[in-house]
């Protein structure tokens, strides 16, 4: 698996496996085991996904050495402050049955992110986290976080797909040494992604699926991607993107699909902020 070096000096796989919406315990455990068997080493979960215990169980069952894995989890909103971040992190670590996590992210850009960040800086210094980062932060919020803290985020996990390409945010992150990571690279199939004529034509040229074309496009932009599936054959397909390269013309054709609009929602929509901040979970 190819990796990218984060600003902490550690290596992060460029292709990862996410477990968002895997609420069935047995299915989640089996999916993580299958993903590791297929070659994935980056496993991405979150306290809010309510499946950290299942991820931890699966990791133990695989027998893969801990230093070969890259495990990410995330701080949910209700504890986005100094004391809350410290406490929720320990609960996540216990559920994952690990001594440390490779990457810990603030899941949403709300609450006392500065207090939570200072707690995360201390956890990193204590060796419990190898790298700290954020999710869904626009560049202005990142600039604010960087200005008033010591550690520059290692990763910003944001929505990136052919319809929302983050053409301004991605270069800004990269220019500050922050690694972009794509959630929902397939936009959950919205806008007819898997049947899109541009993507299907490019796929036919290389004998690849639309999913493989999208993941390769993200890969060539230097962005880490997270693909999710409970089917092992799809996991194997999604990771098999290193044996072809999109041409400059292919990249331009995909760039033309950008709408600069989320396939889901805006993190600056007041109604969405109210909904997210009101979502109290048992984490």
Specify the residue positions occupied by each region the protein language model found:
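Short, acidic/polar
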Residues: 23-35, 81-96, 115, 140-143, ...
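Acidic-and-aromatic substrate-binding clefts and catalytic sites of carbohydrate-active enzymes
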Residues: 22-26, 44-54, 78-83, 109-114, ...
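A structural motif
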Residues: 40, 98-101, 129, 153
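CE4/NodB-like, metal-dependent polysaccharide N-deacetylase domain
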Residues: 7, 85-105, 122-126
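N-terminal binding-site loop/beta-alpha segment at the start of enzyme catalytic domains
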Residues: 1-69, 186, 280-283
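Beta/alpha (TIM)-barrel catalytic core signal, keyed to glycine-rich beta->alpha loops juxtaposed to Asp/Glu
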Residues: 108-283
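A short, structured active-site edge motif that brings together acidic residues
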Residues: 66-79, 102-109, 136-139
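Alpha-helical scaffolding within the catalytic cores
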Residues: 1-4, 53, 57-60, 89-91, ...
């Amino acid at each position: 698996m190819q990796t990218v070096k984060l600003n902490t000096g550690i290596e992060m796989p460029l292709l990862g496996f996410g477990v968002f919406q895997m609420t069935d315990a047995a299915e989640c455990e089996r999916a993580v085991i299958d993903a590791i068997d297929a070659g994935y080493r980056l496993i991405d979960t979150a306290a809010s996904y309510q499946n950290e215990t299942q991820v931890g169980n699966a990791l133990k069952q695989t027998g893969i050495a801990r230093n070969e894995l890259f495990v990410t989890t995330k701080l949910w909103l209700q504890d986005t402050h100094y004391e809350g971040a410290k406490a929720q992190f320990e609960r996540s670590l216990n559920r994952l049955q690990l001594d440390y996590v490779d990457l810990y992210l603030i899941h949403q850009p709300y609450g006392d992110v500065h207090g939570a960040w200072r707690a995360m800086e201390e956890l990193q210094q204590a060796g419990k986290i190898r790298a700290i980062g954020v999710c869904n932060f626009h560049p202005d919020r990142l600039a604010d976080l960087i200005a008033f803290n010591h550690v520059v985020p290692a990763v910003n996990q944001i929505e990136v797909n052919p319809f929302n390409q983050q053409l301004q945010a991605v270069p800004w992150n990269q220019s500050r040494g922050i690694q972009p990571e794509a959630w929902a690279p397939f936009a959950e199939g919205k806008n007819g992604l898997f049947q899109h004529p541009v993507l299907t034509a490019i796929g036919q040229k290389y004998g690849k699926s639309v999913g493989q074309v999208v993941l390769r496009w993200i890969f060539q932009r230097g962005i880490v991607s997270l693909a999710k599936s409970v089917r092992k054959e799809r996991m194997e397909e999604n990771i098999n993107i290193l044996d072809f390269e999109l041409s400059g013309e292919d990249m331009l054709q995909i760039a033309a699909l950008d709408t600069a609009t989320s396939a889901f929602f805006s993190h600056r929509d007041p109604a969405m902020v109210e909904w997210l901040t009101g979502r109290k979970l048992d984490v």
